[in-house]
Amino acid sequence: MKVRLGVDMMGGDHDPLVVWEALEEVLLSLDGQPVEFSVFATPDVHQQLTHSPLSRSVQMIASESFVSMEDSVLAAVRKKRSSMALGLDSLQRGELDGFISAGNTAALVTLARAKIPMIPAVPRPALLVSVPTLSGFAVILDVGATVAVNPEEMVGFARMGLAYRQSLSSSDQSFTLGLLNIGSEERKGTDSHKHTFRMLRDVFGSAFLGNVESGDVFSGKVDIVVTDGFTGNVFLKTAEGLFDFLRHILGDHLEKTIKTRFDYTIYPGSIISGLSRLVIKCHGKSRETALFGGISGAVDLARSNVCGRIAAKFGLEEA
């Protein structure tokens, strides 16, 4: 099937040409696969791209502005013709199968939620990301969409994480869940954590393995880790920073197999789960390698209709 993806060139921490270089690598790697890209950027950036021979392979859509990292959500909403807004508008109209941005997270989540319908019965969106573990990978959500959530919404996150893992599995594999906390004992955490613990145990039974500490996430003990957006974002950025620190300190002494296995940049960016259409948020600091992973990962997720499969799984679970 043909996949149509939109890429927001603007708003990240690096020059838009870094995004373009990653997209060029993706275009070269597709080897004739039916994928169409629409690139959203200001006219001056489009002008710079015309020098690339691959620029003829994409549709270029000019925006009047872009959402910066410093923009408030209100300022972003007011920019009706920003690259982010135009891309989400195209997704809303069904002209795209997915949209990718490394821009302002709060703005992207807010605009996406305003323009793209939520999956029925999903109360709040959550940023879902895959992290490498000793046994493969785990998904963790939320990592930044919603700072404060209640226990009922955390259960909703768990349902989405489970539906996501099931949608990527071709078998009837069972998956385990854990609640990110400051200790493994049931009594640990705030009153909200304790309430969430009881609800997860009641809803998921033996699939819920209880509380997990940050270090346990990488052990592969659980397949889905549930947390609020504040804690999840701190966890994710700490993990990314530690890997970058080790890569910088050890350099060539870090075995290639270890680099490949535990390099977070090879995974797609964060999926705004709960939306009926695919929106992927790449880290604002993403360089070419991470952006390549985000864009190529988006191709695979769009081709597999991951949002539709999550909605179907969610519907079956709720029925």
Curated annotation (Swiss-Prot):
Q: Which reaction does it catalyse?
A: a fatty acyl-[ACP] + phosphate = an acyl phosphate + holo-[ACP]
The record, for InterPro entries, names: FA_synthesis, Phospholipid_synth_PlsX-like
At the top of the EC hierarchy, this enzyme's class is transferase
Q: Name one GO molecular function term.
A: phosphate:acyl-[acyl carrier protein] acyltransferase activity
Which Gene Ontology cellular-component terms appear in the entry? cytoplasm
What is the annotated localization of this protein? Cytoplasm
Annotated GO biological process: fatty acid biosynthetic process; phospholipid biosynthetic process
- Keyword Cytoplasm assigned: yes
Q: Known Gene3D superfamilies for this protein?
A: Isopropylmalate Dehydrogenase (3.40.718.10)
Q: Which keywords are on file for this protein?
A: Cytoplasm, Lipid biosynthesis, Lipid metabolism, Phospholipid biosynthesis, Phospholipid metabolism, Transferase
Pfam families tied to this protein: FA_synthesis
Quote the pathway field.
Answer: Lipid metabolism; phospholipid metabolism
Q: Which family does it belong to?
A: Belongs to the PlsX family.
Can you state the subunit structure given in the record?
Answer: Homodimer. Probably interacts with PlsY.
- Descriptive protein name: Phosphate acyltransferase
Name of the coding gene:
plsX
